[in-house]
Amino acid sequence: MTLQIGVIGCGAIGQDHIRRLTRTLSGARVVAVTDIDPTQAHAAVANHGLNAEVYANGGDLIEAPDVQAVLVTSWGPTHEEFVLKAIAQGKPVFCEKPLAVTADGCMRIVAAEQAHGSRLVQVGFMRPYDAGYRALKQVIDSGTIGAPLMLHCAHRNPSVGDRYMTDMAITDTLIHELDVLRWLTGDDYVSAQVVYPRKTRHASSHLADPQIVLLETAQGVRIDVEIFVNCQYGYDIQCEVVGENGIATLPDPQAVSLKHAARHAIAILTDWKDRFIAAYDIELQAFIDGVQGGALTGPSAWDGYAAAVAADACVRAQKSGAIERIEMAARPAFYRG
């Protein structure tokens, strides 16, 4: 069976997903697209040689009889509306982060999905599908290094545009760590604090960069995450887990070690899409396979809610300078196991 997918949002990430659905992945095809800018939607059809209907809006696309599943890659504040409409239609939906722009919005999606009675939502957190992170989790879960005590992490980008604001270090950048570190440790966060080192001269006047986020989990694991979005030298993701009996470190992407002209060097990636390109492929293939098999297993609406609650606390901590509590609702049995 070929899963017929409708794509809402034909910007950069939307077209990237259309490309992989069309050229890389198996078991699905794009039959419908829409974008707030109709020219973008028509360009996606032309650029990727799609035999797809262009719809005026996301609501009409979701209701289309030939659309069996929905991919939401539109502007963040529209995500909640489209995910809720897909659930109301009983259609599986893959939603890029954020699931909703507020924790309350995420909880409305959680409630709607539970009322439906089975999982329909997968959130676009791709790092749990990255080979390096999966290997790191395997080491942690095996008990080789003992119980995790501390995590030292970094999320570095070469540069960001002038529209990137201080709170986006949390909502656009740290959000990936908030999801994957919770997945790695199997533990929820209970507090967050943000501290500001000396500001880099490469940051815009309105942006505090770098930042350090300090997290604590329910089991007492301490996590520090450096966010440095104007580091200049490349796109660099680091994660070191300190356990009772040893240390496990996220491997860097494979690269050729070059000795030339009296230098020994290894190239560093500069584009986040290249760093996680395989993970993007695997997560979307997992969604296709899950829909066809009748059971989604990827990041859930509850995971989206958990990330949103933690992000809200981190943004409060940015402003207050204090340690902010992270308080989540009780996890429903629907999302356990």
UniProtKB/Swiss-Prot annotation:
Alphabetized Gene3D superfamilies for the sequence: Dihydrodipicolinate Reductase, domain 2, NAD(P)-binding Rossmann-like Domain
Catalysis performed (reactions): myo-inositol + NAD(+) = scyllo-inosose + NADH + H(+)
GO MF term set: inositol 2-dehydrogenase (NAD+) activity; nucleotide binding
InterPro entries cross-referenced by the UniProt entry: Gfo-Idh-MocA_inositol_DH (IPR050424), Gfo/Idh/MocA-like_OxRdtase_C (IPR004104), Gfo/Idh/MocA-like_OxRdtase_N (IPR000683), MI/DCI_dehydrogenase (IPR023794), NAD(P)-bd_dom_sf (IPR036291)
GO biological process: inositol catabolic process
Primary enzyme class: oxidoreductase
Any matching Pfam family: GFO_IDH_MocA_C
Top-level taxon: Bacteria
Keyword hit for Oxidoreductase: yes
EC number: 1.1.1.18
Keywords, comma-separated and alphabetical: NAD, Oxidoreductase
Quaternary structure and interacting proteins, as annotated: Homotetramer.
Function noted in UniProt: Involved in the oxidation of myo-inositol (MI) to 2-keto-myo-inositol (2KMI or 2-inosose).
Record family assignment: Belongs to the Gfo/Idh/MocA family.
Name assigned to this protein: Inositol 2-dehydrogenase
Species of the source: Ralstonia nicotianae (strain ATCC BAA-1114 / GMI1000) (Ralstonia solanacearum)
Gene for this chain: iolG
